[in-house]
Amino acid sequence: MSESLRIIFAGTPDFAARHLDALLSSGHNIVGVFTQPDRPAGRGKKLMPSPVKVQAEDKGLPVFQPVSLRPQENQQLVADLQADVMVVVAYGLILPKAVLEMPRLGCINVHGSLLPRWRGAAPIQRSLWAGDAETGVTIMQMDVGLDTGDMLYKLSCPITAEDTSGTLYDKLAELGPQGLITTLKQLADGTAKPEVQDETLVTYAEKLSKEEARIDWSLSAAQLERCIRAFNPWPMSWLEIEGQPVKVWKASVIDTTTKAAPGTILEANKQGIQVATGDGILNLLSMQPAGKKAMSVQDLLNSRREWFVPGNRLA
């Protein structure tokens, strides 16, 4: 193989852990792992380590969990490791300019979109919601901007009509490690060819919110169906019935026009709950009332048919 590089890995969630796993099998030398501090989780709010920390400790790697990399003493942790390159995957902390310049080959990031489209925090969800035909991963050289660095390598995959953010996440978690290992080989060999991002093609993937996931019936049925897939598994699209939130897991578009006001229930049977939208009809197929498990519309109608009387309007 190419030169074995001294690598610092920085990441936090499962998506990052899958990249660390690929690095551990690549023959490179992982000299340190940075991940976010343990966070309260679950009903008991017990402090839980990140997936990256669990994996790193299992492999006996040194783990660092600073709250910030701005303090000089935390930057010194990076400097002392004398890395050739720092690999950053969904770390969640800002890397100051001083840290970016410490490794011999700089810092590289695995981003879940085909840059310069969808810079920012939620590229997977935004690409789905926008109706993009494809997405992918970009390995880029990091600079002080938000996903503005030169691109080193890209891999793409189609977005299907059945994809959710969950399934796309898994696809990109397969592509990312492939692109990362190839990029590291090119950096080690001196064959990497950085490409400047075209600023005229930039779009931004803003962070998601639960309120944003509330179904807006004035949108088209096609937009709402994509929204439902984009927000699955988090934060989940939802509507309000009798003052309680009801999550929507799955829906389809019925290619028929209607003059009914957006939000009006047109039909409610075992084939689905058909609702008028700003353009077209959305057919709700799987839903989850508060405190219950996700269920088919047929099961929901058996217990809550009074919620879905044709002619009534959903909020």
From Swiss-Prot:
Catalytic activity: L-methionyl-tRNA(fMet) + (6R)-10-formyltetrahydrofolate = N-formyl-L-methionyl-tRNA(fMet) + (6S)-5,6,7,8-tetrahydrofolate + H(+)
Keywords, sorted A to Z: Protein biosynthesis, Transferase
Pfam families in alphabetical order: Formyl_trans_C, Formyl_trans_N
The enzyme's E.C. designation: 2.1.2.9
GO molecular function, a single term: methionyl-tRNA formyltransferase activity
Positions bound to (6S)-5,6,7,8-tetrahydrofolate: S113, L114, L115, P116
Keyword Cell membrane attached: no
Coiled coil spans: none
Entries under InterPro entries matching the protein: Fmt (IPR005794), Formyl_trans_C (IPR005793), Formyl_trans_C_sf (IPR037022), Formyl_transf_N (IPR002376), Formyl_transf_N_sf (IPR036477), Formyl_transferase-like_C_sf (IPR011034), GART_AS (IPR001555), Met-tRNA-FMT_C (IPR044135)
Domain of life: Bacteria
Keyword Nucleotide-binding part of the UniProt annotation: no
GO cellular component: cytosol
Family membership noted in the UniProt record: Belongs to the Fmt family.
Stated role: Attaches a formyl group to the free amino group of methionyl-tRNA(fMet). The formyl group appears to play a dual role in the initiator identity of N-formylmethionyl-tRNA by promoting its recognition by IF2 and preventing the misappropriation of this tRNA by the elongation apparatus.
Designated name of the protein: Methionyl-tRNA formyltransferase
Organism of origin: Escherichia coli O6:K15:H31 (strain 536 / UPEC)
The encoding gene: fmt
